[in-house]
């Protein structure tokens, strides 16, 4: 119960079933069953709009080397919950039904193969989608590890429907991503090189992008850790942007997107000053090669490079 009503702007039809009013309630039940080789669990909820959301998963250990997972969800377009979180393609527990099927296979020693396919349907319109729509997400990942060496290959195909340029029909937005990496981890140091590729297609338009990156870690002393990385990216536009992981502060997650042409380089360090105090710092610079300024408006930077600095002190009592 709120003292003031929620009043979303429902002049846009896709917002017609957003939460509104002052009084909300949700009731739900979770359930499950465990077996030595398979398990079933799920949760079903009902809201004050008398709409249902349910998520159910079935896992099966087919052999000692192969495990399977199936996950079904149904989130009514009339269902809403202010703080709910659950597996979905669209990012919210509303207006979606779908089936996810995945497998984890270890055919031989040191080799693992993971794959999934996920099909989803949304009966109600969404932002930039003026009707019911479908999506299809697929991933194949292969990892080979032997001793300190690791080789990884990954391919992802994602298809979503969106309004075309004329907004008179839906068109398929097709994004393909491929990644290859090789890593080495020793007692005091580690290194990794990675290559990423992206191809984007929508309504007759295409764009592509690629990125190469390398990072290294070193622990010269018991109390000191150092990491550095460098990235070169080259994409046609934002649609073919590329992503890479960056180590950051404790409890933070950094997975920035890069587009255009440029170089990113950064240094990370952590020092355990004593048993109570630790200091973590990171400094990085992104230098664009295809522009003379960055961003616009109040955030505009009148040069082609920008530097970011983070520091964190942690005291353990």
Residue positions per predicted region:
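Exposed, low-structure sequence patches enriched in small/polar residues
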Residues: 2-11, 16-317
């Amino acid at each position: 119960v709120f003292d003031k009503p929620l009043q979303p702007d429902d002049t846009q039809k896709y917002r017609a079933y957003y939460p509104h009013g002052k009084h909300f309630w949700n009731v739900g039940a979770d359930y499950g069953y465990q077996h030595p080789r398979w398990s079933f669990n799920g949760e079903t909820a009902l809201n004050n709009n008398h709409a249902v959301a349910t998520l159910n998963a079935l896992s099966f250990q087919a052999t000692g080397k192969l495990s399977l997972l199936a996950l079904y969800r149904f989130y009514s377009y009339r269902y809403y919950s202010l703080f709910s979180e659950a597996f979905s393609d669209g990012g919210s527990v509303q207006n979606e039904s779908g089936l996810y099927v995945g497998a984890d296979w270890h055919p031989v020693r040191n080799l693992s193969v993971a794959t999934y396919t996920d099909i989803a349907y949304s009966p109600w319109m969404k932002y930039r989608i003026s009707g019911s729509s479908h999506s299809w997400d697929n991933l194949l990942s292969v990892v080979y590890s032997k001793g300190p060496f690791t080789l990884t290959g990954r391919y992802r195909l994602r298809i979503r429907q969106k309004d075309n340029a004329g907004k008179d029909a839906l068109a398929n937005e097709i994004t393909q991503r491929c990644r290859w990496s090789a890593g080495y981890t020793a007692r005091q140091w580690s290194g990794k090189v990675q290559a990423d590729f992206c191809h984007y297609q929508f309504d007759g338009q295409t764009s592509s992008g690629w990125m190469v990156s390398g990072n290294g870690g070193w622990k010269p002393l018991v109390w000191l850790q150092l990491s550095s990385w460098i990235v070169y990216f080259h994409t046609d536009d934002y649609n073919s942007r590329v992503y890479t992981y960056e180590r950051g502060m404790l409890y933070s997650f950094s997975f920035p997107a890069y587009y255009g042409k440029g170089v990113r380089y950064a240094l990370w360090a952590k020092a355990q000053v004593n048993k109570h105090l630790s200091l973590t710092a990171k400094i990085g610079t992104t230098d664009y090669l295809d522009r003379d300024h960055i961003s616009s408006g109040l955030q505009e930077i009148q040069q082609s490079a920008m530097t970011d600095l983070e520091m964190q002190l942690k005291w353990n009592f």
